[in-house]
Amino acid sequence: MNTKRDFIDTNTYTQEEITYMINLGLKIKESIKNGYYPPLLKNKTLGMIFEQSSTRTRTSAEAAMTELGGHAQYLAPGQIQLGGHETIEDTSQVLGRILDIIGARVDRHKTVAEVGKYAKVPVVNFMSDYNHPTQELGDITTMVEHLPAGKKLSDCKIVFVGDATQVCVSTMFMTTKMGMDFVQFGPKGFQMKDDVVEIGKENAKKYGGSVTITEDADEAMKDADFVYTDVWYGLYDDEMPKEERMNIFYPKYQVNAELMAKASDHVKFMHCLPATRGEEVTDEVLDSDYSIVWDEAENRKTAMRAIFVYLLNPSLNYASKAVAEKYDAEFELMLKNAVDSRNN
């Protein structure tokens, strides 16, 4: 039976599965902080396809594999034939025969979807123009670590300030899946599309919580437990000049001390990073005591560990002692015969 599962869109996962991955990631994190690196990915190899530059995603994925006994290969743009001389289908089938798991950060979501369709091993979406699921899991893990006293996730409200980037969309997907109230505080023309919002509303209907889109700062920030923002000009924004975008977002949608003061007194600030200091967020907020961005960045690795172990767990069938001894003896004999033949 084919047990392959991809991590391309968290909407294909249940709340129970997400909760399991959060707990798995935190347990592995606890184990490593106490000095034990569980070999949960021993002898497993991750291939990483990057059509874009990356700091947090690449380093967290490589470190996650290494710490758990596996290995990661970086496949840079121009070094592999992905949709160039060779079709995505063919490249994916080849990589699926050589690697144990594939991660891909791509320009277009359909690319990672195709890799997932044709590769016979699990495929992880390291970010596309549609969503950023590994960021989602790291973020929700960080929220669990910083829950307000006496609250659970389903009691919390999160506000995403600014543009409806793929991180905004992903934040809505994940938080509504966990029963939270989600608000996008952003200008018209930069709000989430209706079909995307509908997914969040379906989650809210099933799990509780709500989805709100508003241009009213007071309405958005009232009783917020978490406030999140992203850059105003990102990897996929090339249709409007940067200066024009800045004029739309600044100063109303900048996360500063004045805006944060409208939230609850225990509010936490989040950012997927990299941040453009002085634009979408001030230094005062980013470096404040209520900023949890560095924990959030660290939990990218926590999330990667959980995702890789969860997806690869069905294939972790290690040989029995008897089988290992059988092959050790056969290899020893074959290598001895090879040496003898060279010496004759």
Curated annotation (Swiss-Prot):
GO cellular component labels: cytoplasm
Keyword Secreted: no
One of the GO BP terms on file: putrescine biosynthetic process from arginine via N-carbamoylputrescine
Family designation: Belongs to the aspartate/ornithine carbamoyltransferase superfamily. PTCase family.
HAMAP family (UniProt xref): PTCase
Record InterPro entries: Asp/Orn_carbamoyltranf_P-bd, Asp/Orn_carbamoylTrfase, Asp/Orn_carbamoylTrfase_sf, Asp_carbamoyltransf_Asp/Orn-bd, Orn/put_carbamltrans, PtcA
Protein's recorded name: Putrescine carbamoyltransferase
Its job: Catalyzes the phosphorolysis of N-carbamoylputrescine to form carbamoyl phosphate and putrescine. Is involved in the degradation pathway of the polyamine agmatine.
UniProt cross-references to SUPFAM superfamilies, sorted A to Z: Aspartate/ornithine carbamoyltransferase
Pathway(s) this gene product operates in, as recorded in its UniProt entry: Amine and polyamine biosynthesis; putrescine biosynthesis via agmatine pathway; putrescine from N-carbamoylputrescine (transferase route): step 1/1
Catalytic activity annotation: carbamoyl phosphate + putrescine = N-carbamoylputrescine + phosphate + H(+)
Keyword list, A-Z: Cytoplasm, Polyamine biosynthesis, Transferase
EC nos: 2.1.3.6
MF-aspect GO terms: amino acid binding; ornithine carbamoyltransferase activity; putrescine carbamoyltransferase activity
Binding residue positions for putrescine: 271-274
Domain of life: Bacteria
Pfam families: OTCace, OTCace_N
Annotated organism of origin: Pediococcus pentosaceus (strain ATCC 25745 / CCUG 21536 / LMG 10740 / 183-1w)
Site residues (Important for structural integrity), renumbered to this chain: 29, 145
UniProt entry tagged with the keyword Metal-binding: no
Designated gene of the protein: ptcA
Subunit details: Homotrimer.
Protein localization: Cytoplasm
Binding site for carbamoyl phosphate: 54-58, 105, 132
Primary enzyme class: transferase
